[in-house]
């Protein structure tokens, strides 16, 4: 799935990966909303989840040769692009779900 952004297959793969990420995040937030019905529960999860995830991704990118030794530079760029978009969704989806209430 991690295709070099310079390749022609990058955009379709990226859109498919992004759609899958959005679906999984919607499901996670929907289930969490059923478990914790307090006000702003999903927003708190989005903020804390993003903070923890960004820290973990920072460490993984910092130690790239140890954690992802087989990735090319293009794949690392593709991973970083997906990661930024995923965290954007991780912050926006809870706002959308909270607004619908």
From Swiss-Prot:
Where in or outside the cell? Cell membrane
Which organism was this protein described from? Bacillus subtilis (strain 168)
> Is the Cell membrane keyword given for this protein?
yes
Span-the-membrane segments of this chain are 10-32, 45-67, 77-99
The highest taxon in the source lineage is: Bacteria
* Topological type in the membrane: Multi-pass membrane protein
Q: Which InterPro entries match?
A: Uncharacterised_YnzE (IPR020509)
In Swiss-Prot or TrEMBL terms, this protein is called Uncharacterized protein YnzE
Q: Which UniProt keywords apply?
A: Cell membrane, Membrane, Transmembrane, Transmembrane helix
- Provide the Gene Ontology terms for cellular component: plasma membrane
Keyword 4Fe-4S on entry = no
**Primary location class:** membrane
């Amino acid at each position: 799935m991690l295709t070099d952004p310079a390749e022609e297959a990058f955009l379709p793969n990226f859109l498919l990966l992004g759609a899958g990420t959005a679906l999984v995040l919607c499901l996670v937030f929907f289930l969490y909303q059923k478990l914790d019905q307090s006000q702003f529960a999903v927003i708190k999860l989005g903020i804390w989840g993003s903070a923890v995830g960004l820290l973990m991704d920072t460490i993984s990118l910092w130690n790239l040769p140890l954690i992802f030794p087989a990735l090319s530079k293009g794949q690392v760029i593709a991973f970083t692009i997906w990661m930024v978009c995923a965290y954007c969704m991780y912050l926006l989806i809870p706002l959308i779900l909270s607004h619908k209430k």
